[in-house]
Amino acid sequence: MYERILVPVEHTPYDDVILAHVRKLASTCNNASIVLIHVADGWAARNINALNLRESEEMKSDREYIEAIADSLEKDGFEAEAILAGGDPAKEIAACAVRENCDLIAMTTHGHHGISDVIRGSVASELRHITMVPVLMVRASPRTTPASPTVPS
């Protein structure tokens, strides 16, 4: 069914929700490979290449986080890779899905975050309008976060 699943992670407890679903899904799809992406969208991340900047401490932490998740997935028998991108999250996720030949994007949604989502919309909402890759959205809230985290804190 699916061969390569792109999983955007946010470096929050919500990630455990989608990762639990993706583990099950990848297992039923002949161990589909999993591509993790975190899109840093701070000023440094958006301008790192244009201004030849070094990774910020936040970006280093994000890289360590997604690499730890990839290592955990690999220990469980999945083929996994981690990508740290910078820029507009929806656009970077959509571009990564095409570049990495992913046939599914699986991500969490967690409802509106106040006025900012009303004004600019959520990443999930924007992504579904700009990608041709199917998107699986799983609603997550602190109540649905699994008891045992995927990556030790």
Q: What are these model-predicted stretches?
A:
Residues 1, 24, 71-105, 142-153:
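Structural beta-alpha unit
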Residues 21, 58-69, 92:
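Short, solvent-exposed amphipathic alpha-helices that sit
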Residues 35-37, 81-85, 136:
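General small-molecule cofactor/ligand-binding pocket signal
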Residues 1-49, 153:
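Small/aliphatic-rich secondary-structure junction motif
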Residues 4, 96-153:
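Gly/Ser-rich helix-loop-strand patches that form or flank binding pockets
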Residues 37-64, 143-153:
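Acidic, proline/glycine-rich short linear motifs
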